[in-house]
Amino acid sequence: WSAPWRFDAVQRAGGSGFVIKGKRIMTNAHVVSWARQIIVRKYQDPKPYLAKVEYIGHDCDLALLTVEDESFFEGVEPLEFGELPKVRSTVVTYGYPAGGEEISYTRGVVSRIELSVYSHIGNRRLLSVQTDAAINPGNSGGPVIQDDRVVGVAFQGISGLENTGFFIPPPVIQHFLKDTQDGKYDGFPRVGVNLATLQNPAYRALLKLPDNNQGVRVDRILPKS
């Protein structure tokens, strides 16, 4: 409060990304959210390039960047997307965990595929893939590769658990990309209601439901649904 005219100290953070067709870079939304300036560098190239967010999906934790200087893309082949990997198949993560100048490669196995909470905004459950390949801070936004194709984008781990990382699978990525084709990102649809299960006996008694009644109760309809 002694100097209210001063801005907060600028903090530096890093992540990973990869080039896709259309001269764009894909990364995580949480890597570039609230950034005052975005600087990207190519592998083994010390030159910094200014980038800006073209599209961002906070619900699916994905973002597309464009680079002002198109010379950034010279000699760079865009990566192609593959299909959803199978459980117990092998994948390789690429990225810069904890920063560093050299890219890191980590091999792992697909452990399971299920709906899970995306921690970036914490209130959406979308399809995700769990792997035992290490995914650490700095890996975020990096590609997960199988058979020379991108089968995911690394995006989160679980604090306190070893060999447990998660990546965003192709169905979510393709939905995000298709959504941006009209020039704006609308996001993943939601049902628009809050539901309550009817398993609790006290709750069932409150609603005066018979014992053989099953289903869920609509507690609330969200605005604009």
Q: Regions from the language model: what does each represent?
A:
Residues 18, 134-153:
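Catalytic nucleophile loop of clan PA
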Residues 69, 73-74, 97-101, 150-213:
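C-terminal cap/linker of serine protease catalytic domains
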Residues 17-19, 51-53, 110, 144, ...:
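Conserved hydrophobic positions within beta-strands
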Residues 90-125:
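Chymotrypsin/trypsin-fold serine protease catalytic domain
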Residues 3-10, 55-60, 113-129, 180-186, ...:
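Gly/Ser-enriched beta-turn/beta-hairpin loop segments
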Residues 133-134, 138, 142-143, 197-225:
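PDZ/PDZ-like domain segments forming the peptide/carboxylate-binding groove
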Residues 14, 21-103, 137, 159-162:
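Conserved active-site neighborhood of the chymotrypsin/trypsin-like protease fold
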Residues 55-57, 71, 114, 135, ...:
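A generic structural motif
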